[in-house]
Each structure stands twice: as structure tokens, then as C-alpha cells.
């Protein structure tokens, strides 16, 4: 019987199961004193029938301990690698490292990237320095980018006036708007995203604080969570929002008026004046609410509070855009926001001629939606998805896009 040389020397004998990637399996009997490199050499000789074809083949392979999935170090002994009898080892060929690119190839690749790179502003100015200046109306080009939002606001202002006149002709207009006013109170109290509120309460935040945080942060769960963490130890965080107090006061006033009005008699007040007062109340409840975080951030830059609120109102509560407005020419001005579209323009006439819009203007809910979108553009999505107001907004958008392309 053939006896391997390693068994002649002292040392604990190990029986190791070797597996190669081609599916071959065999048993190697070695002592724990030999190195992993020697074992690897024996394994390669077994695979190549007793001779190594490539001298570098030893460095191109590695032994992996199957159960622990670790690569064995060539310089350590089997004892140092803590191999046990009947362990399974995998003989694996190492991945060849990617070839190092030649300098000529690197230079050519860099040159190709430079050729494909778009020129920056400095390069454009340098290349066009010798060209004659041409009169380009850059103001119009910039205006077209925000044309839809600007025109939509003007359209809403004019449509609100038309809707008020149409609804005032309805004999039940006062009752309709009293109900709308009550709906508005309920809407203000209940407008909390239930899913977002549940997420915050499941995190352990008190419900009252979570509601306040969501209202302050436009129903953004992430921003509301940040606010709750920042104000965790702030006792003022439990105080109600100013808008909640004003809503309660307005609601009480409306209730009081409703109770006293019947006693004054039917002819005590002109219905038109009463409608005007209701319209004013609705508009007060839909007043623009600046983002408190944006107000604080912009005031810390040194801007006056009134200027900051005007900037946020003009730029739909977008802090970055408001900052640019404050630093720029401040156009459009807050006064421009209350100007309607030219009522003789083809665009406005096309909108008024649309049957869906005509029908929608007789619905008090449409007027409420227009008022809300006018002062809080972030709520536009809510009204676009509403079954009553959504079709009206869709028709306005389609008419605008159609006429804008012609």
C-alpha cells in the first residue's frame, strides 16, 4: 500500500474532502502542520494527474472552507486555519484581475470623453465673444416657462367673479352658501391625512401633536416627524394653531348670526349684502397660509416678515423661489396676483363657452375650490381629483393647452 510522505512525520492526521468546480471529489490525507499552499499544490497535482502544466497555476487558485465560506490563507498551516477532520474544501480558480489599460488607451479614452462633453457657460462665452450681440427678448422666454401657472391664477380670479354673479341669481343662494360655509368649517377641522396621522401615531407621537405637525408641514410625514422630534421637549408644541382658534371664533360668529338672523325678519337685510358678507367670510377662511418653516428660514436671512409672506404667496410657498424673488426684481408683485385675465380674450371666452365649465360655475363647491386653489395652490391636486370640481379643472387645462399651441 502506498503511504504518503506527510504521514511519516509527526502531527495530527486530517482527512479532508476536496471538491473542484468541474464536479470532481476526492479525499486528501494530510497532517495539520503543512501549509495551505502545500495542500493546494497536492490538489492541483491530483487534478492534473501528477504534474502542474502551468507554473503560475498555484497562484491562480484558492481553497475555500465550505461551511464557513472563508478563503484559506496560503501562508498559514492547516492547524492555524483551524481545519478539522472530514472538513470540506473547495478548489476554486481566482478571477483574473482586469488588465491595466495602457497609457495610450487612457489618453484616447479621456480625449473621447472631452470631445463628448457639453460646453460649460465659460466655454460658450469664450467661443461667442467675437460674435455681434443680437436683441433677444429673454423676458418673454422666461415668462413662457411659468405661463400656465400665471395664467391659471388670472383665470381663477375672473372665474370667481363670474361664479359669484351666477350664484347670486339663485333664489336659494344664501342657504347654499351658508351650507358651503359650514362645510368649509368641517373641512378645516377634518383635513388631516388619516394614513399620515396613523404612521406618526404608530411611531409613538401623541395624536394632537401629530395633527399639528401635519398641518404645519402640508401633510408631509417626513417633515412632520422632523418637527415633532425638534419640539419633543417644547411645551408650546401642545398649543393649538392660530388658524384653529380663528376657525372656532368664526364658526361661533356664524352660528350666532344664524340664530339672530331669523328674529330680524325677512326684509331686515338686503340678500345681496348678506351674500357679500358670506363671500367675504369664505375668502377670509381661505386666506393664504405661509409655511412657518419657510418664514423662519427667510427671516433669518434678514428679510422683513411682510416681505417674506408676500414672497411665499407669490411663489406658492416654495422657499427657494421666494428667496430668488426677494433677491430679484420682485415681479410679479403681490398686487398682480389679484388681477384677473382679460375677459374679452379668446382664451377666457373659450373657457366660458365650454358646457362643463358653465355647469360647474353654478355649483357653490366650484367657487370654494377656486378660492382655495387661488390662495393655496398646493391643494390643487385635491380639487383635481374631486368628482365635482375635477372635470371643470380638466376642461380649463385642455382649453389653455390647445390655444397655447396655436
Curated annotation (Swiss-Prot):
InterPro entries: STI1_HS-bd, UBA, UBA-like_sf, UBA1_UBAC1, UBA2_UBAC1, UBAC1, Ubiquitin-like_dom, Ubiquitin-like_domsf. Gene3D superfamilies: 1.10.260.100, DNA helicase RuvA subunit, C-terminal domain (1.10.8.10), Phosphatidylinositol 3-kinase Catalytic Subunit, Chain A, domain 1 (3.10.20.90). Residues 186-231, 289-329 form the UBA domain. Keywords: Cytoplasm, Repeat, Ubl conjugation pathway. It is found in: Cytoplasm. GO terms for cellular component: cytoplasm. One of its GO terms (biological process) is protein ubiquitination. PROSITE patterns: UBA, UBIQUITIN_2. Non-catalytic component of the KPC complex, a E3 ubiquitin-protein ligase complex that mediates polyubiquitination of target proteins, such as CDKN1B and NFKB1. Within the KPC complex, UBAC1 acts as an adapter that promotes the transfer of target proteins that have been polyubiquitinated by RNF123/KPC1 to the 26S proteasome. This is Ubiquitin-associated domain-containing protein 1. It comes from Xenopus tropicalis (Western clawed frog). The gene is ubac1.
Amino acid at each position: 500500500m502506498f503511504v504518503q510522505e506527510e504521514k511519516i512525520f509527526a502531527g495530527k492526521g486530517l482527512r479532508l474532502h476536496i471538491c473542484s468546480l468541474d464536479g470532481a471529489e476526492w479525499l486528501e490525507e494530510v497532517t495539520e502542520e503543512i501549509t495551505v499552499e502545500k495542500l493546494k499544490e497536492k490538489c492541483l497535482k491530483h487534478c492534473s494527474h501528477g504534474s502542474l502544466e502551468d507554473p503560475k497555476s498555484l497562484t491562480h487558485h484558492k481553497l475555500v472552507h465550505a461551511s464557513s465560506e472563508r478563503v484559506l490563507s496560503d501562508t498559514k498551516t492547516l492547524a492555524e486555519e483551524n481545519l478539522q477532520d472530514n472538513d470540506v474544501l473547495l478548489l476554486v480558480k481566482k478571477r483574473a484581475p482586469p488588465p491595466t489599460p495602457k497609457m495610450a488607451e487612457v489618453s484616447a479614452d479621456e480625449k473621447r470623453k472631452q470631445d463628448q462633453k457639453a460646453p460649460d457657460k465659460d466655454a460658450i462665452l469664450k467661443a461667442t465673444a467675437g460674435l455681434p450681440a443680437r436683441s433677444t427678448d429673454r423676458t418673454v422666454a422666461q415668462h413662457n416657462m411659468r405661463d400656465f401657472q400665471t395664467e391659471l391664477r388670472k383665470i381663477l380670479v375672473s372665474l370667481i367673479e363670474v361664479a359669484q354673479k351666477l350664484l347670486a341669481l339663485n333664489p336659494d343662494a344664501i342657504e347654499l352658501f351658508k351650507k358651503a360655509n359650514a362645510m368649509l368649517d368641517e373641512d378645516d377641522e377634518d383635513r388631516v391625512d388619516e394614513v399620515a396621522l396613523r404612521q406618526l401615531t404608530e411611531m409613538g407621537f401623541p395624536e394632537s401633536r401629530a395633527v399639528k405637525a401635519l398641518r404645519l408641514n402640508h401633510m408631509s410625514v417626513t417633515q412632520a416627524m422632523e418637527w415633532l422630534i425638534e419640539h419633543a421637549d417644547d411645551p408650546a408644541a401642545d398649543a393649538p394653531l392660530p388658524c384653529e382658534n380663528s376657525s372656532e371664533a368664526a364658526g361661533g360668529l356664524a352660528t350666532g348670526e344664524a340664530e339672530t338672523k331669523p328674529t330680524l325678519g325677512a326684509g331686515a337685510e338686503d340678500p345681496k349684502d348678506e351674500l357679500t358678507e358670506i363671500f367675504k367670510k369664505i375668502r377670509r377662511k381661505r386666506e393664504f397660509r405661509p409655511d412657518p418653516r419657510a418664514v423662519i428660514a427667510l427671516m433669518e436671512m434678514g428679510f422683513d416678515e411682510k416681505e417674506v409672506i408676500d414672497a411665499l404667496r407669490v411663489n406658492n410657498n416654495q422657499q427657494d423661489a421666494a428667496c430668488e424673488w426677494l433677491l430679484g426684481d420682485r415681479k410679479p408683485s403681490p398686487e398682480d396676483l389679484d388681477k384677473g385675465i382679460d375677459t374679452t380674450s379668446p382664451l377666457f371666452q373659450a373657457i366660458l363657452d365650454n358646457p362643463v365649465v358653465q355647469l360647474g360655475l353654478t355649483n357653490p363647491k366650484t367657487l370654494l375650490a377656486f378660492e382655495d386653489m387661488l390662495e393655496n395652490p398646493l391643494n390643487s391636486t385635491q380639487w383635481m381629483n374631486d368628482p365635482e370640481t375635477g372635470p371643470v379643472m380638466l376642461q380649463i387645462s385642455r382649453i389653455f393647452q390647445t390655444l397655447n399651441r396655436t
